């Protein structure tokens, strides 16, 4: 269970995984309700009752000189765990599923709406995504190694109160045989 009351809560699991060899990400979650004032396109609305992040470590040769400088500065301030890129699978309040937009704080993270609105709130929902294909769609190139997976429930921008539950999260080599809800 994750709660946010004008705050944010998250949990990170560091990994070192080849995204092309282990491309399938499966998870389940349930929210009481989405963040009413959430807006995937604005910093003031960058809050979600549920999100699952996949972070990536981009080899230095794939970064521009400016990106390498920014990465060095970020790691000097925050340590080596600062990811180079990320995909955030979110439950938005209004954008339709399938929407992919840059995070309002950084262009190195893409927000991918997998659920929207309140119609399915209060129910456990399961998802399976091909993170390699999603990375290509979001960034236009093959994915680098996965450096971590995280969950986050946050309302620090909107000041709302939400609650979410997260089930198992797994990476696999091939799609599951079960029929997912999304």
Q: What kind of region is each of these model predictions?
A:
Residues 1-10:
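Short carbohydrate-recognition loop motifs
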Residues 14-25, 118-121:
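Extracellular/lumenal carbohydrate-interaction signature centered on repeated Trp-anchored short motifs
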Residues 22-32, 147-153:
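A short beta-strand element within beta-rich, extracytoplasmic domains
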Residues 28-34, 57-59, 132:
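Solvent-exposed strand-to-loop "edge" motifs in beta-rich extracellular domains
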Residues 41-45, 160:
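Short consensus segments that form the blades of beta-propeller domains
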Residues 47, 51, 56-105:
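Extracellular/luminal beta-rich ligand-recognition
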Residues 50-52, 107-117, 121-160:
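Extracellular beta-strand ligand-recognition surfaces/modules
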Residues 149, 168-171:
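Extracellular beta-strand elements of beta-rich domains used
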């Amino acid at each position: 269970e994750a709660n946010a009351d004008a705050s944010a809560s998250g949990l990170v699991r560091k990994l070192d995984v080849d995204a092309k060899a282990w491309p399938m990400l499966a998870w389940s979650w349930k929210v009481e309700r989405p963040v009413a004032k959430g807006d995937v396109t604005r910093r003031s609305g960058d809050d979600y009752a549920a999100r699952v992040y996949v972070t990536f470590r981009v080899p230095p040769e794939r970064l521009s000189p400016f990106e390498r400088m920014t990465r060095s500065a970020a790691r000097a301030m925050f340590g080596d765990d600062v990811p180079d890129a990320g995909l955030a699978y979110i439950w938005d309040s209004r954008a339709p599923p399938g929407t992919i937009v840059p995070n309002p704080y950084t262009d190195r993270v893409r927000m991918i709406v997998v659920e929207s609105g309140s119609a399915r709130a209060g129910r456990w929902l399961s998802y399976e995504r091909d993170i390699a294909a999603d990375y290509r769609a979001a960034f236009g190139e093959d994915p680098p190694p996965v450096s971590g997976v995280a969950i986050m429930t946050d309302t620090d921008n909107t000041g709302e109160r939400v609650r979410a539950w997260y089930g198992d999260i797994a990476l696999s080599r091939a799609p599951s045989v079960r029929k997912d809800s999304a």
